[in-house]
A protein has these predicted regions:
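Residue-level detection of the helix-turn-helix DNA-binding "recognition helix"
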Residues: 35, 49-50, 60
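Hydrophobic/aromatic-rich alpha-helical bundle segments in the mid-to-C-terminal region
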Residues: 121, 151-192
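Amphipathic alpha-helical packing segments from all-alpha helical-bundle domains
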Residues: 71, 104-112, 127-165, 186
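Basic, helix-initiating cap at the start of DNA-binding domains
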Residues: 1-23, 27-36, 53
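Alpha-helical DNA-contacting segments of helix-turn-helix folds
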Residues: 54-62, 120
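Hydrophobic alpha-helical connector segments
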Residues: 57, 71-113, 164
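Short hydrophobic/aromatic patch on the recognition helix
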Residues: 38-48
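Secondary-structure edge/capping motif, primarily at the C-terminal ends of alpha-helices
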Residues: 73-84, 116-127, 174-178
């Protein structure tokens, strides 16, 4: 009879994350995660079909939490600026509210990228995920842009969809490069 282990999926994810961060991507294996969790290799494969899916699963869980906080920042921007009126009509965020939202979003991205900097800079992980990078990057940019569209409505010179994607692309690029909000915030706020 198979043994029942409570929260085994979470334990596997936590152990895989720990090993990747402490030992590196190439050192973490399905076997090492199984051994550390006291389960058979087959048990890990019941939850994750590959090492790459195991890694993607713990990164995705943290990304989703990051996106919840980013969405909240964008909603707060709209709520804080709900008494401000755009010259063409309708409620919008003011520049202070937009700056606060952009800073909050950037800070969330910085926390996420700092948490996974070891993984993002790991050469063997980079080689493994190189083929899927363009597709995943586009997906991340779109996910990041979506909540920002609510305050990009104020900008009438360009499409709000494009403006949100433009800001998202810059934030992704510069957080990964280790730049601070102070370095790019004054440029981004000029778009509004």
């Amino acid at each position: 009879m198979p043994k029942i282990i409570e929260n085994i999926r979470e334990k596997l994810l936590d152990e895989a994350r720990r090993q990747v961060m402490e030992l590196g991507y190439s050192a973490m294996t399905i076997r090492s995660v199984a051994r550390a969790c006291g389960v058979g290799v087959g048990t890990v494969y019941n939850y994750f079909p590959s090492k790459d899916m195991l890694v993607a699963s713990f990164v995705l869980a943290d990304w989703q939490e990051c996106m919840v906080r980013i969405g909240q920042s964008c909603r707060e921007c709209v709520e804080a600026g709900s008494n401000l009126k755009h010259p063409v009509g309708g409620s919008v965020c003011g520049s202070n509210e937009v700056d606060t939202a952009l800073r909050s979003i950037y800070d969330e991205l910085r926390r996420f990228t700092e948490k996974y900097r070891t993984l993002f800079q790991d050469e063997s992980a980079g080689a493994t995920f190189a083929t899927s990078f363009p597709q995943r990057h586009k997906q991340l940019r779109s996910q990041l842009a979506e909540p920002m569209q609510v305050f990009c409505q104020v900008q009438s010179r360009v499409s709000p969809d494009f403006l949100a994607e433009f800001i998202a692309e810059n934030m992704l690029t510069w957080t990964l490069a280790g730049r601070t909000y102070e370095e790019i915030g004054s440029i981004l706020i000029q778009l509004f």
